[in-house]
Amino acid sequence: MNAPTTLDQLLAAASEEAPRLREIPYNYTSFSDREIVIRLLGPRAWEVLSRLRDERHTGRSARMLYEVLGDIWVVQRNPYLQDDLLDNPKRRGQLVEALNHRLAEIEKRRTPGDDPTRDALVGELLVAARQAVQAFDVSFRETSDLRRQAQRVLRKHTARDNIKFDGLSRVSHVTDATDWRVEYPFVVLTPDTEAEMAGLVKACIELDLTIIPRGGGTGYTGGAIPLTWKSVVINTEKLEAMSEVEVVSIPGHDQPVPTVWTEAGVVTQRVSDAAERAGFVFAVDPTSAEASCIGGNIAMNAGGKKAVLWGTALDNLVSWRMVTPQAEWLEVSRLDHNLGKIHDAPVATFELRWFAPDGRTERRRETLAIPGQAFRKEGLGKDVTDKFLSGLPGIQKEGCDGLITSARW
């Protein structure tokens, strides 16, 4: 039960804060005027606007400025409008002309003789606004050029239909289960095979794009959310190949053991069903099992209600394959699996093997020995705060150190 608290202090603090003003038109987002002004004009512009708010006479200049910001903002937050303006340079020119016309009308209304200090602040805002309009205009040319370059580079590694700039694809990949939206991705990639991954990652690095791996998009940590417009979301949902439960030999065991191999885009429930058909239980059982994918389960070290008995993803992985931020292949194998929870083993040993982008040329290998107890926090169980996990790649990193492509459980 939560400790009781009085609301008087909280209400008093809330009343002292500046009100969340909503004067910018066409703003259907959760961003306040302050956040939009800072994004488009900079922090100094918001300070100036706040000073001038109490000195308005008719408010017409402020209204025209907010209309300029509203027009820019509604286009920036709507990929369909962006595509329309990219396809219609004449219409785009008319919009930019209208924005500059409003700023020119504000310029006409300046009265430097009445209050030089106030007029200087208005001039400062006009300079920032003109720069914002110019940047808005230039952004379309930059986007168009970058799209052509991206098409040329990415088509070497995947089919043209897998390179998606359309509004629907970008809108579908702007957020995850958090419903938190920051930026729309520049492009969405939907590769057909695991083999395409390393080449695509290398191409995205050449294009200077921030790479975001994505599976089912069911996460609640924001790991699949683009934070910059120059970002690419690599959707792994087409990587849905998997085996039935098969008995194979694994390192450290004389007798073969039952395992299942899956690609990163396989929905978790499909693996559970395969295990059940063979008379086994798949331990990884998040609430989102009907929609989440295996790659995300590994990146998050997913658990679920069955984890109490049989452990989380890390406890049950035999090996996994991933692409590093250097566009190399990395294969991680557990050498001495105890067929139980990893913290019960005195030492957990992993073999790391790096390969060239072709997937065949081995570049180096390394053995990583980690005390079993290092994976758990006393009295807590899985330590979600320990992202490093003694340097073990892929697991619990939320996609930050590479892109999971397949695994054996």
PLM regions: where:
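Residue-level detector of anion-binding/catalytic polar loops
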Residues: 209-210, 281
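Glycine-rich beta-strand-to-loop/alpha-helix junction loops that act as flexible
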Residues: 214-218
